[in-house]
Amino acid sequence: MRVISGQVMEYISGRIYDKRKDKRILVALDEFASIGHFEVLSPFRKFRKNGANICILTQSLADIDLVYSEKERRVILDNSAYIVVLSANDSSTRQYFSELVGREQGHDKRGNEKREFAVQPEEWKEFTNHLVVIHAGGYVKLKKNFYFK
């Protein structure tokens, strides 16, 4: 799998993309961490101009941290136009996503204004029927549409 992934990345890196005649390529890397460490940061930064997008799928950010460093994982996520979160069990992952989504103005029980996470860290592990899409303009909470139901 690693050899094939590497060859695809190399092909796209050298590809001369003409948006008038060439089709865009979507590279979906499921169980991303299981592929092992390879140079993904450079392709992530420049694949869009080569007519390609990378979709990294993983069960946990901790899986990526085991293969890449936490800093490399942050660079990967920072270069992602969209992040889709189905759920998160790890407390540091939940905190990270809550910080990424940001805070909203709210009120406490006495009516005083306060800023709270738009999505509380505990909520991430309770997503059974919803998902969150994080993008440059903010976030959106969507209902999951199960094909098998």
Identify the function of each model-found stretch.
Residues 116-125:
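A short, acidic, amphipathic alpha-helical segment used as a generic capping/interface helix at domain edges
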Residues 1-112, 119, 139, 146-148:
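Conserved P-loop NTPase motor cores
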Residues 126-147:
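P-loop NTPase catalytic cores that bind/hydrolyze ATP
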Residues 77-78, 125-127:
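A short, structural micro-pattern
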